[in-house]
């Protein structure tokens, strides 16, 4: 017999002798210990099964089967008859983008006068928005970008992220987006939230402190994450239901939230100096121009199995053809050559002699998404 087997046999034999020679009270204690051990084993098995089930659920990919982005010229705001109407037109774009889960809104300069230096000035905060959008400038692009960014941002972050500026003067009159990532003060059903890094010193070995719109502040787990104050972040809270001084967790991304929960986590805004830059990005599987000469949106050929990324390009008041023709240095001269496909919204002629960009965006998004959802259901 192997020495280990002898040892095991001896231990078991000693336990038996002790049990048989024990009193009635001692035997009852042994029985309680045995029942307690059995109960703990059962609890352990149940807990492991629940954790395995939870992990399986979390691994399900809820990413949508397709992604839609749009490109619009900022100059369409020049037609607004007042500052209030200008803000309202931008708000219509934001509402349409949120309703139909647009991933990105690209704002391009239809006149091709915008420079990279002007775009950099907008992003580094030196642009103030003091000029009124007009045909002689490209301020409409910056106005549109600022209003779209403001509306997409959760209300509790706006005070820290958006200083008082002329483009936002009438933003309070707009209908709220009420997007799925615009969580309320007392809403604790979701472990993900948007936050902003505060100008506060954290303890050694711990990360920055953030405002996430709850009654307590949020602390990032790791001090390896170095973020400047007033940086917007998406966070995952690890101790949401616990009684603690601060919420704690890690930084994540909107794409991760969508993949794990299926929720729409807002759109991003990007400025481009011209339509040519938009088309040269090669970021999308299908680039569709919106034109009255195109085919119906329901006839657009799409392979839904590849989770396509689709860009819908809208023109200004003169249409997408005028935007293409204004690109003097481009290798194409016609809209048919610039885009993979041209689409329109209806087989009938419009009842109105003019098309407004904000109305066109809403109708095209509705029809394209309906077409893609139909293909996905097949």
Curated annotation (Swiss-Prot):
Keywords: Centromere, Chromosome, Cytoplasm, Cytoskeleton, Kinetochore, Methyltransferase, Transferase. GO terms for cellular component: centrosome; cytoplasm; kinetochore; spindle. GO terms for molecular function: methyltransferase activity. Its EC number is 2.1.1.-. InterPro entries: Alpha/beta_knot_MTases (IPR029028), NA-bd_OB-fold (IPR012340), Put_MeTrfase-C9orf114-like (IPR003750), tRNA_m1G_MTases_N (IPR029026). It is found in: Cytoplasm, Cytoskeleton, Spindle; Chromosome, Centromere, Kinetochore; Cytoplasm, Cytoskeleton, Microtubule organizing center, Centrosome. Its main location: cytoplasm. One of its GO terms (biological process) is methylation. Required for association of the centrosomes with the poles of the bipolar mitotic spindle during metaphase. Belongs to the class IV-like SAM-binding methyltransferase superfamily. This is Putative methyltransferase spot-1. The gene is spot-1.
């Amino acid at each position: 017999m192997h020495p280990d087997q002898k040892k095991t046999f001896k231990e078991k034999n000693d336990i038996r002798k002790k049990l048989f020679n024990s009193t009635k009270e001692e035997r009852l204690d042994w029985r309680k210990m045995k029942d307690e051990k059995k109960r703990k084993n059962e609890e352990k098995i149940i807990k492991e099964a629940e954790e395995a089930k939870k992990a399986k659920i979390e691994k399900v990919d809820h990413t949508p089967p397709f992604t839609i982005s749009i490109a619009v010229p900022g100059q369409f705001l020049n037609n607004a008859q007042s500052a209030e109407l200008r803000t309202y037109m931008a708000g219509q774009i934001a509402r349409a983008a949120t309703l139909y889960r647009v991933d990105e809104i690209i704002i391009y300069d239809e006149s091709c006068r915008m420079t990279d230096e002007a775009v950099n000035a907008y992003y580094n905060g030196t642009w103030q928005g003091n000029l009124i959008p007009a045909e002689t400038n490209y301020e409409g692009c910056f106005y549109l970008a600022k209003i779209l960014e403001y509306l997409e941002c959760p209300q509790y972050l706006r005070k820290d992220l958006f200083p008082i500026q002329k483009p936002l003067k009438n933003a309070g009159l707009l209908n709220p987006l009420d997007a799925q990532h615009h969580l309320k003060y007392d809403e604790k059903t979701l472990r993900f939230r948007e936050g902003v890094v505060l100008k506060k010193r954290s303890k050694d070995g711990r990360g920055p402190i953030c405002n996430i719109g709850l009654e307590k502040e949020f602390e990032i787990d790791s001090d390896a994450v170095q973020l400047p104050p007033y940086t917007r972040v998406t966070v995952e809270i690890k101790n949401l239901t616990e009684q603690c001084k601060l919420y704690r967790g890690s930084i994540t991304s909107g794409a991760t939230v969508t993949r794990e929960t299926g929720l729409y986590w807002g759109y991003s805004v990007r400025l481009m100096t011209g339509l040519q830059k938009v088309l040269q990005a090669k970021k999308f599987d299908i680039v569709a121009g919106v034109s009255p000469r195109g085919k119906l949106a329901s006839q657009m050929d799409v392979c839904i199995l590849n989770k396509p990324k689709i860009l819908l390009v809208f023109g200004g008041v003169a249409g997408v053809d005028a935007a293409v023709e204004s690109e003097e240095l481009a290798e194409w001269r016609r809209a048919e050559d610039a885009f993979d496909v041209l689409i329109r919204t209806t087989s009938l002629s419009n009842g109105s002699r003019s098309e407004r960009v904000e109305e066109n965006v809403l109708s095209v998004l509705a029809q394209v998404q309906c077409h893609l959802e139909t293909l996905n259901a097949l």
